[in-house]
């Protein structure tokens, strides 16, 4: 969408974590970003001021709770409170990246379930709906007692790889860990390609001892994961694929954090191209072979469909050309 959206009762606001994607979402939706200010005092306290009326409006607040996670989360909570006190009709949050979603279960004795805690805090603050992108664990949706729309990036990736000609039996989609099989299978189905899995000890020091379940010899491999953090998982997986006879290795992830020297790790790995979405704005150095694929159109369309009470199901698939549309 390029024209101004007709219904002025809907308003978008961007907080400070990822202004670039917010601007793209606003442009795609045809809704200008609302006027507000956010500043941090010398002691770390956050002050927000909404500089226009929101009374009776449906508000969508765009904020990735990425690094610095706690500052961005608190900024979001304070903005929610400000909208509630200003008599907004509904307050909806758009989280391109949902921090703390990896802490979704008790993996060891006496561990918290922080994703549930964050869900409780956001709900208590007064939100009506969550729109997010590729949750690390889909069960996090169940931590909320309000609607949660978890948009998928796999259709975006499938369209990209199809246009590059990376599909069919000479391509294999690889999950770098056994917990990502469902994601790999989803992309593989779009590309009409087989899948493979790398299984290895979870200890970082033993990653290079991983082994492949499936056939990658003589094939172009696409590694897929949801979060690219330090880059070690992709880097070691790419080395294993190279040793196992893969001709080229590509990598794709929904969220590119690039933390802890990830650029240095990935630049020495045999990976031809890394694709991530723009869900996270990072200050860390990014490898030169990274391509950003914007999720802004997808999120903008979801916002408009929600506001117009239309189904989101058309956003959850990609129909490659030449396939039967029946």
Swiss-Prot record:
This is Putative ribose-phosphate pyrophosphokinase 2. It comes from Streptococcus pyogenes serotype M3 (strain ATCC BAA-595 / MGAS315). Pathway: Metabolic intermediate biosynthesis; 5-phospho-alpha-D-ribose 1-diphosphate biosynthesis; 5-phospho-alpha-D-ribose 1-diphosphate from D-ribose 5-phosphate (route I): step 1/1. Pfam families: Pribosyl_synth, Pribosyltran_N. One of its GO terms (biological process) is ribonucleoside monophosphate biosynthetic process. ATP binds at residues 43-45, 102-103. Belongs to the ribose-phosphate pyrophosphokinase family. Class I subfamily. GO terms for molecular function: ATP binding; kinase activity; magnesium ion binding; ribose phosphate diphosphokinase activity. Homohexamer. Mg(2+) binds at residue 136. Its cofactor is Mg(2+). PROSITE patterns: PRPP_SYNTHASE (PS00114). InterPro entries: PRib_PP_synth_CS (IPR000842), Pribosyltran_N (IPR029099), PRibTrfase_dom (IPR000836), PRTase-like (IPR029057), Rib-P_diPkinase (IPR005946), Rib-P_diPkinase_bac (IPR037515). One of its GO terms (cellular component) is cytoplasm. D-ribose 5-phosphate binds at residues 225, 229-233. Binds 1 Mg(2+) ion per subunit. Its EC number is 2.7.6.1. It is found in: Cytoplasm. Its main location: cytoplasm. Keywords: ATP-binding, Cytoplasm, Kinase, Magnesium, Metal-binding, Nucleotide biosynthesis, Nucleotide-binding, Transferase.
